[in-house]
Amino acid sequence: MLNLFKMALRNLGRHRRRSALSALALSISLTLLLFMAAFFKGEMRSSMEDTLRLSSGHIQVRATDYDPDKLSVAWEYLLENPQQTAAQIASLDLVKFATPRLFASGIASSGDQSSGVQIIGVDPASPANEPYVVISGSFPAADDRDGILIGAPLAESLQLKVGDSLNLLVNTAEGNVDEQPFSVRGIFSTGSSTYDKGIVLLPLAKAQAFSGAGERASIIFVMLNDREQAAAVAAAISGANIKVLTWQDMNELLVLVNDFSNAYITILNLIILGVTVTVIVNTMLMAVFERTREIGILTALGMKGRQIIVLFLAEASLLALGGIAVGLLSGWLLASYFGSVGIYFGDIGISGMIMGDRIYPYLMFEDVIKLTVTAFIVTLLASYYPARLASRMEPVEALRAEK
């Protein structure tokens, strides 16, 4: 067996150009496979984390009749005693934090510019606000009655900076419209322009007073130490006239897109591997026909058909190892670089999902192992037919072929 591998190595050395092209095809294939796996994993990882941290949380507690699409602050749709409920939930095992939030629809305007916005009343001290990175100014304090925090894209469109004034109109609990001036205390960025341009944050107490919600809230926003425990924690939350939803319940589209992306990457992998198989088969067939006389001599000297198959598979395996080594290095470098700087896609979004402006590829070790093993096995399988063809050549006909 060792002698066959030595022969295979010499054969590859005698045909350096063909060997290099075959290894290059495999290395390019593996590079693409690794980068695409990292890209789609990074995309779904980012959209999942952003959607959970900014929108749904791991668990939400709502009033039974609350409709998040309407953003109504009518009392019958809101939770009573939200601070007390949030404190009870926060005391449960596995809960990282729980905080009340109030949602209302409104219009922000400055001069002759205006924009529809979602008003979110938050507890300024809650760690749930960490995704709202303040890039200018500061977060309004809990007792601030005229301060507001706005997204960077909204500040740009309304031509506002910290300290400027804007008018905010809100639909109140009584079904009326109220309007008040606010001072821009700070400007935030979450990394998603689509989200940031439609959100303004107020201290919860001010949002309640401004909208006429009293001491009520729209939801209790809950984050866990492990999101996979959402169902177990949700089962432990009970109360009258409330509805408890897990992140899977609230993000069916996100889960579906995640499953679809797995199927999509599988199809792309098959296409790339199919092209690679074609290149390898053609290269190996070319090698067989170019070495017809050599095969005839080996057969005449007593080499069995099985040994010829092993010889060609040994050549294929050595090519695979070389191509895989280069592919692993280039794929890792590519994924690492873009995983650090990101790939800018700009203002994009899908209803029901929050996506950042940049996608950061994320290469997982299990993907590296899976794709590496797959590439090696595919190379051997692609080489088997040419090897089998070589093993079936008759010595006399093979020797006559190049006379």
Regions found by a protein language model. Name each.
Residues 1-6, 242:
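Short, membrane-interfacial amphipathic segments enriched in basic
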Residues 9, 363-403:
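C-terminal membrane-exit region of the final transmembrane helix in multipass inner-membrane proteins
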Residues 16-43, 259-294, 317-326, 374-381:
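Hydrophobic alpha-helical transmembrane segments of multi-pass inner-membrane transport and secretion
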Residues 37-116, 143-144:
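Hydrophobic, regular-secondary-structure patches
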Residues 102, 113, 117-123, 135-205:
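Hydrophobic secondary-structure segments that place a key small or acidic residue at a functional site
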Residues 172-265, 272:
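Mechanotransmission and gating elements of multispan inner-membrane complexes involved in transport
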Residues 285, 294-338, 370, 378:
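Transmembrane alpha-helical interface segments in multi-pass membrane proteins
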Residues 325-370:
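Short helix-loop junctions at transmembrane helix boundaries
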